[in-house]
Amino acid sequence: MADSVRFPCMPFPPCFLVCTRDDIYEDEHGRQWVAAKVETSSHSPYCSKIETCVTVHLWQMTTLFQEPSPDSLKTFNFLPRTWRLESRNTYRGADAMHWRLVNHSQFYGTEELVLMLDSR
């Protein structure tokens, strides 16, 4: 009989993320997430409409830099201070904006969340 292949279980996305420092968020389990990239585009693979699309890539990190990068202070200051998971694929920011969870994956040990600002 062939052995079954087991893949590591993907953890559930965080229930909430609270900004602790400029581009660093902490979830309910004390895990640190860094806002690694913010994209603003009218042509995004996550957007189906012709409009400006804002996506943020959050990476779960075990080791963080001591000081925030100077660029992050300028680039990420519009992100909400907290995100709370409202439904299976929607986060609500402290600013009452909705962010759709478009990807939750793990690549070489780094867990990633990709959130897209939902223009309802």
UniProtKB/Swiss-Prot annotation:
GO terms (molecular function) for this protein are: protein serine/threonine kinase activator activity
Which SUPFAM superfamilies did the record assign?
Oncogene products
A family per Pfam: TCL1_MTCP1
Q: Which InterPro entries match?
A: TCL1_MTCP1, TCL1_MTCP1_sf
Recorded family membership: Belongs to the TCL1 family.
Q: What is this protein called?
A: Protein TCL1B4
Organism name: Mus musculus (Mouse)
